[in-house]
Amino acid sequence: MGHRRILTGEQIAQLFDPPTDRRGIIRHYTLSAADLAMIRRGRGDHHRLGLALMLCYLRYPGRPLHAGEIPDPALVSFVATQIDVLPDSLGAYLRVDQNRRRHSAALQDRLGLRPWGPRVAADLADWLLGHALETDRLVDLAALVLEECRGRGILLPPPARLERLCIEVRYRARREIERRLTEGLSADQRRRLDALTERRLDTSQSWLAWLRQIPESAKPASMLGVIERLEHIRAIDIDPARGHRINQSRLAQLVREAGRTTVQHVAGYERRRRHAVLTAIDLDLSARLTDQAITLFERLIGAMFRKAEGRHARAFQAEGRAINEKVRLYARIGAALMAARAGQGDPFAAIDKVIPWDRFCSTVMEAETLVRSEDFDPYEVLSEHYAGIRRWAPAFLATFEFQGVPAAASLMRAIAMLRAMNSAGASTLPKSAPTAFVRPRWARHVLTAHGIDRRYYELCVLAELRQRLAAGDVWVTGSRQYRAFEERLISRETLQVLQKASGIPVAIETDFDRFIETRRTWLDARLAEVDARARGGLLPDVTIEKGVLRITPIEKSTPPEAEALAAKLYATLPRIRITDLLTEVAGWTGFLDCFTHLRTGEAAADPRVLMAGLLADGLNLGLTRMAEACSIASLGQLAWTADWHIRDETYALALRRLVEHQSREPLAALFGSGTASSSDGQFFRAGGSGRDASRINAHYGPEPGLKFYTHLSDRYAPFHTRVIAATASEALHVLDGLLDHHGDAPPRQHRHHTDGGGVSDHVFALCALLGYVFAPRIPDLKDRRLYSFDRPAAYPTLAPMIAGRINVDLIRAHWPDLLRIATSIRTGTVSASVILRQLAAYPRQNAVAAALRELGRLERTLFTLDWLEDPGLRRESSHELNKGEARNSLARAVFIHRLGEIRDRTFENQKHRASGLNLLVTAIILWNTRYLAQAIQALRQVEDVPGTLLRHLSPIGWEHVNLTGDYIWSANQQSTENHAGLRPLRPIPDTTIKAA
């Protein structure tokens, strides 16, 4: 029986073939003087060229040139130039296979290369096992083996043997992981784990299925449901430390595999595998339920405040008519009194003319009942929500263990006291109850003349706990999301090791004195320059008069001729169904190979079924309706393919491949240089079951929803997307997309643009630390204050805009902390959004958050000065953000079904919707980019196409793409590797384009 191939043809080529890019060829195939001397001893040009190429192949990738193999022309040309022969002479060498075999044997001996054999394979298998415990991806394991072969001087094995070795080692690694997870489990623990697959009493549902149904809506019943499930998990008594015996990504993979398998299948696993999977599920559910409980806690307390504020506002509105009547009455009385005084009249008689005295006295008493405190404090009605909070709060406090920084000690004592009172059924607070945590706004409600108000005290404890959890001052044992701030960062010891070795991975001078002196010189000079130009009226489209900043808005820069050209080009693009477009793009890029099976690593057996699943996500159609609208798969087939092949990491790999292909298209260089990007959030309403898991942002109206936050390159490639709450700050997520896309090496001086939602001083600071130029379009710039090192009076024109001096001492005191935060983000120890969320939630007196904000003020001031002085920067920012808005219009058109609403309840399904949408949008952009290039070429054959107009072209059009109807594939439309053909263009419209 033949070996079943798992690695795709493209993956094998990447592993075994020489590089074809110029940089890779130079790196691997530059010959030394000794190499040239040996090669020149060959007989004839063809022998010398063949010998040189064989030498190159044996060094990298580490195998001989095969019989019948024709090397890449770029490689042949590069080597031929070095040995001073013609590339065409290779043909004579390749026709005589005896020369190839003889050269291969001689060079293997010269280089000391060993052949692949059973002993070598066994040694490499033992070596690979450690890596297989870290990653399960077959292509990654194969790449590691080949790299080790090169290091050990071993000839690369045939692809089939390499696959077999990796599969065997992967199986060994899985068995080892199962052993580590189950070793030491008691008989009672094993019995309780097995009970998870049994049915619950009087139901047809298993315990495991019930545990997986985690309540999402912010209701007291949901909180109690989460706590009930968590107590059931804790009763199994699996030590969380057991999960640290294996790599966390492998633990997560076990959980994902089990999540795509029925409970009956899990119950049928052999004993050790079954207990390992159930242990992994137990550990994962414990953390997920803990995080969900804290999330519900935050939402329930937040809802309490919103309801109180809403009730307060409604009451005020209800009293508005009475208040208005009183104001009008007192205005008349005031006018009568003023007239009486002017005419030396009797003021009381004047009042009687307006309203009888007795009635006037009544209106005064009525007015007193309408009077409210100046701040209209909604806390006055919070106590009315106490009964609802008590439905779940005692169980919540009893279930979780909270720990905190020393500053939260008073709050920790208060929680412990309430926990004890709830347990004992006590209703009266002791006189010694901790109150140091009570903030001034709460004090007048909590600390009354009659003592401590129990209701307000408990509400204050919960509100303060919510704020401290968000800030990271308090953390929860067993939580992933709500961990201690220190635990999220790279350790101080590791940071010191990095500093002593190769240096920490930040983009600025790490010596603070040198850093701040450079910034001081720079900022002083820029302030002086801009101040002088502003004083002389030399800032283009900018005036500063009496401290008031005015900037002339950017005018539309796209000429009508460019719009006409775009319309003509799009009119020639072939009309195409979205199914055919996706098939064609898959043929160009092979992106479907990225959607590998979760367990086996194999590509999908039927690409059409996989594409149907992707379209179900991206078009917002859903699997059920997709099964009805396509003829190639049942709902069961679609669901199986989606469960095992479509997930976050495969979406990310496929998107990266599409983005790379689109960015390499020659036409894409006209859209941008590749050194800039932008990001923006797009709101989608929630419908159906998705409403309970969504939030209301008044900016988008009264309906709940969520946002897809997407990053777009200046070449129109949407390289990252993330689902965020409708109320979430976009600034928290700016850096995540950049870091995920660029990895460890951001392009030098990469400029990133956002609108006002992405702006914060913390983002300015971290962008500078991590090597990005942050260039947002700051709203209400005239109200944003600048900062300086010198006295503001040194810059008289800008002085009204300068709020004060930069606190250098504060930045200096916490410089090591700022470098540690940046290093933790750069190394992937923690995401930027998590750090920024905690820093933003800190009280203003937190020194680290304040120091980062101070650094951000410095960077924002430098940027603002550039913004005022450079109209080109303002135009670029507007242009890049317009690209994002255009992309959002395309996304809105693609996300056409279900009224464009998000109706998924779970966050995982919502993420799949966002990823599927972004993948389809990117595929359309890539398809448009390639076909627009063909359209330009065709148009130039009949008329002049000014290059100045092409700069305004974009690949965002979609009128030619059929996004609705039946989704049809046929056998001859399936994608094939190395597909190169393009569809014929439509006739060119009979119009002439003129240069602007």
Located regions from the model:
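Short, conserved catalytic/metal-binding motifs centered on acidic residues
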Residues: 62, 623-627, 677-683, 752-757
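Acidic, metal-coordinating catalytic cores used for nucleic-acid/nucleotide bond scission
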Residues: 751-762, 779-785
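Structured, charged N-terminal subsegments at the starts of enzyme catalytic cores
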Residues: 524-629
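Electropositive nucleic-acid engagement tracts
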Residues: 601-602, 618-676
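Short, basic/hydrophobic alpha-helical segments
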Residues: 729-750
